[in-house]
């Protein structure tokens, strides 16, 4: 007696953002930090078109001249795969 098997499709992976960060410096001159991300926010049904957003932040922290103003940025991009 063979029972029917239920076959489910493999779930799509979550649309996780890409993160990039970095920094460096020394105690005398201060430290720079930077963080950027990219997130795809829309993809066409056929996967040929997509739109993404890219926010970011950077700042120079304590040094001989104090902290720099934080730099906040955001961008958007369109991609077409052919």
From Swiss-Prot:
Q: Which residues carry this modification: Phenylalanine amide?
A: 82
Query: Per its UniProt entry, which superkingdom is the organism in?
Result: Eukaryota
Keywords, comma-separated and alphabetical: Amidation, Antibiotic, Antimicrobial, Immunity, Innate immunity, Secreted
**Region (Disordered): which ranges?**
1-32, 45-69
For this record, an example GO cellular component is: extracellular region
Q: Where in the cell is it found?
A: Secreted
- GO biological process, alphabetically ordered: defense response to bacterium; innate immune response
Its primary localisation, in coarse terms, equals secreted
- What is known about what this protein does? Antimicrobial peptide required to resist Gram-negative bacterial infections, regulated by Dredd.
The record's comment on protein family reads: Belongs to the attacin/sarcotoxin-2 family.
Q: What else is known?
A: There seems to be a family of diptericin in protophormia. Diptericin A is the predominant member.
Q: What is this protein called?
A: Diptericin-A
Q: Which organism is it from?
A: Protophormia terraenovae (Northern blowfly)
